[in-house]
Swiss-Prot record:
Taxon lineage: Bacteria, Bacillati, Cyanobacteriota, Cyanophyceae, Gomontiellales
Function: Catalyzes the phosphorylation of the position 2 hydroxy group of 4-diphosphocytidyl-2C-methyl-D-erythritol.
EC number: 2.7.1.148
Protein name: 4-diphosphocytidyl-2-C-methyl-D-erythritol kinase
Pfam family, one: GHMP_kinases_C
Active site residues according to the UniProt entry: K11, D150
First-tier enzyme category under EC: transferase
Name of encoding gene: ispE
Pathways involved: Isoprenoid biosynthesis; isopentenyl diphosphate biosynthesis via DXP pathway; isopentenyl diphosphate from 1-deoxy-D-xylulose 5-phosphate: step 3/6
HAMAP family the record matches: IspE (MF_00061)
Species of origin: Cyanothece sp. (strain PCC 7425 / ATCC 29141)
GO MF terms held by the record: 4-(cytidine 5'-diphospho)-2-C-methyl-D-erythritol kinase activity; ATP binding
Residues at which ATP binds: P108, I109, G110, A111, G112, L113, A114, G115, G116, S117, T118
Signal peptide positions (record): none
Length: 324
């Protein structure tokens, strides 16, 4: 049985519009109806999957899953999405060999970059190969949807339009080659449930109330112009059309995030925005040199030892596999 290394890219949002409450037969489900453009970036975690060693098998783990991580704040039990992904596969395909997972964490935790989701996606892809299950990408995405709304996207990666709860995906043309500078304070996190609940409290009166109204709102929204810019790979237009409704509630509540966004904007990028519910802010650049200038400008403007910055690129794929 082979062992595998998997590269799991982070994800940012280029567009996030809240249409209203997610409805089934005009009844709210408790989620939001969203229109998003999701984008993989080259900042990645790395996972190694291998069959359990004899020593590990002697521990009689149930399920037979052993997780290691080089980040001290990452839990190693069922509270970790990586562990839950492996447990889900074991539940669906019992009797397979146990697995030992080593996670090398590079994507910051609590950053809104789908770090947990992309790691879970890597486990699904890796176990499908290791156990020789022969599952299709669509079947893996259906399993992933049981773990979280971002997991199906992270399996395929690249650039996608996501609607509904965010799990109805349509692939878009690749944007590989555009650079992105990411910024996050490592002592700061934003609760995603808080962000959406606060948005609902403040803006529910403006929600589209029926499925028909929501579809009209979606078609009239700004995503169409962004999709056209993506089709033409027009980085300047893409940068100008970035949009995130959650900025309306997160930025006023988190002045450091708002200040970081302003400092990114001061560097004249193609565009800048908070990703998802934050607190990560990003700026797009059309070259490595421009990205370096943005990085240096923000670093010089914010003398905060808790601010982490990364330069990476938009990338055109999700989970990448390398046999060990």
């Amino acid at each position: 049985m082979r062992a595998y290394t998997l590269i799991a890219p982070a994800k940012i949002n280029l567009f996030l519009q809240i249409i209203g409450d997610h409805l089934q037969q005009d009844q709210p489900t408790g989620y939001h109806n969203l229109v998003m453009v999701l984008q993989s970036v080259s900042l990645s975690d790395e996972l190694q999957l291998r069959p359990l060693s004899g020593e590990a098998r002697s521990l009689r783990l149930d399920p037979p899953i052993l997780l290691h991580c080089d980040h001290p704040q990452v839990p190693l039990d069922q509270t970790n999405l990586v562990y839950r992904a492996a447990a889900l596969m074991w539940q669906k395909f019992p009797g397979q060999a146990g697995v030992e997972i080593t996670l090398h964490k590079r994507i910051p935790i609590g950053a809104g970059l789908a770090g947990g989701s992309t790691d879970a996606a890597a486990v699904l892809v890796g176990l499908n190969l290791m156990w020789e299950l022969g599952l299709t990408q669509l079947e893996l995405q259906e399993l992933g949807s049981q773990l979280g709304a971002d997991v199906p996207f992270c399996i395929r990666g690249g650039t996608s339009l996501a609607v509904g709860r965010g799990d109805q995906l349509s692939p878009l043309p690749d944007l590989e080659g555009i650079y992105v500078v990411l910024g996050k304070y490592h002592d700061l996190s934003v609760s995603t449930p808080w962000a959406y609940q606060t948005y609902r409290q403040q803006f529910q009166a403006s929600y589209a109330q029926t499925l028909e109204e929501q579809e009209q709102r979606r078609q009239q929204g700004g995503s169409g112009a962004l999709l056209k810019a993506i089709a033409h790979r027009d980085g300047g237009q893409i940068g100008q059309l970035l949009h995130n409704d959650l900025e309306k509630v997160v930025l006023p509540a988190y002045p450091r995030v708002e200040y970081l966004r302003q400092q990114f904007a001061n560097q004249s990028p193609l565009g800048t925005m908070m990703s998802g519910s934050g607190p990560t802010v990003f700026a797009l650049a059309d070259s490595a040199a421009a990205a370096e200038e943005i990085y240096a400008g923000v670093r010089g403007a914010i003398a905060d030892p808790y601010l982490d910055l990364w330069i990476c690129q938009l990338c055109n794929q999700g989970i990448q596999v390398q046999p060990l």
